[in-house]
């Protein structure tokens, strides 16, 4: 014998009247809400005639900072190692400069990039940053692979993002550590300091080891560390 249907309605549940069973009040309420929203300010843009300008914290496509006509990047490879979708690849080359290395070629596959910003977080030179560019179109897969010619952007155009990074880093570390540029005196970001050493101190050449002692420090001697020569 099939079971009898069970009424699951609560005994205290209010029964709908005739108009409510027709759902007309709900329809009128929906139309009234739509009419109110039609008269409120619009949130949409008439793209492409009107463009949206993102805030400084926006994570658009990653770009490389170009400083004095050269990439700030030292080709350390940290961004490529930190990239979750493995979208970044590069090859380093030696250069006659205080930074010693820069990328011979640098590529980002924009079809793989997820705009997470990890590359920007780990970069010790602030050489790769997230721009405000969000409108990307490609006609083929080859066009989606950006090389140095598409990635390099002058530092002046990225001033807002670089200043935002300086404000952003301090609160991240809280009371444990304060981000200071002078902690990185050997890096490309501190060219004024290096120029001062060359001109004021009369140094004919600047070695990458000039800011540290030639002999191993106490912490290195404890495990037998030896400084490599030149």
From Swiss-Prot:
MF annotations from Gene Ontology: 4 iron, 4 sulfur cluster binding; iron ion binding; NADH:ubiquinone reductase (non-electrogenic) activity; quinone binding
Domain 4Fe-4S ferredoxin-type intervals: 60-93, 104-133
Pfam families, per database record: Fer4_7
EC number: 7.1.1.-
GO biological process: aerobic respiration
Keywords for this protein: 4Fe-4S, Cell inner membrane, Cell membrane, Iron, Iron-sulfur, Membrane, Metal-binding, NAD, Quinone, Repeat, Translocase
Quaternary structure and interacting proteins, as annotated: NDH-1 is composed of 14 different subunits. Subunits Nqo7-14 constitute the membrane sector of the complex.
Function: NDH-1 shuttles electrons from NADH, via FMN and iron-sulfur (Fe-S) centers, to quinones in the respiratory chain. The immediate electron acceptor for the enzyme in this species is believed to be menaquinone. Couples the redox reaction to proton translocation (for every two electrons transferred, four hydrogen ions are translocated across the cytoplasmic membrane), and thus conserves the redox energy in a proton gradient.
Name of this protein: NADH-quinone oxidoreductase subunit 9
Naturally occurring in which organism (per UniProt): Rhodothermus marinus
């Amino acid at each position: 014998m099939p079971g009898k249907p069970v009424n699951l309605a609560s005994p205290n549940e209010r029964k709908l009247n005739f108009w409510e069973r027709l759902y007309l009040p709900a329809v009128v309420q929906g139309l009234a809400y739509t009419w109110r929203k039609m008269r409120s300010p619009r949130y949409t843009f008439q793209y492409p005639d009107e463009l949206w300008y993102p805030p400084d914290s926006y994570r658009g496509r990653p770009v490389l900072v170009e400083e004095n006509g050269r990439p700030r990047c030292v080709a350390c490879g940290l961004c490529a190692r930190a990239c979750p979708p493995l979208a970044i690849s590069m090859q380093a080359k030696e250069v006659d400069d205080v930074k010693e290395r820069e990328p011979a070629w640098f590529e980002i596959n924009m079809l793989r990039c997820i705009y997470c910003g990890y590359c920007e977080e780990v970069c010790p030179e602030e050489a790769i940053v997230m721009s405000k560019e969000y409108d990307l179109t490609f006609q083929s897969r080859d066009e989606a692979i950006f090389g140095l010619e598409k990635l390099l952007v002058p530092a002046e155009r990225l001033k807002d993002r670089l200043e935002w990074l300086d404000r952003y880093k301090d609160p991240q570390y809280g009371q444990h550590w304060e981000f200071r540029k002078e902690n990185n005196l050997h890096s490309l970001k501190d060219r004024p300091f290096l120029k001062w050493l060359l001109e004021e101190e009369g140094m004919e050449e600047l070695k990458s080891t000039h800011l540290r002692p030639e002999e191993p420090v106490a912490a290195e001697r404890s495990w037998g560390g030896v400084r490599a020569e030149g």
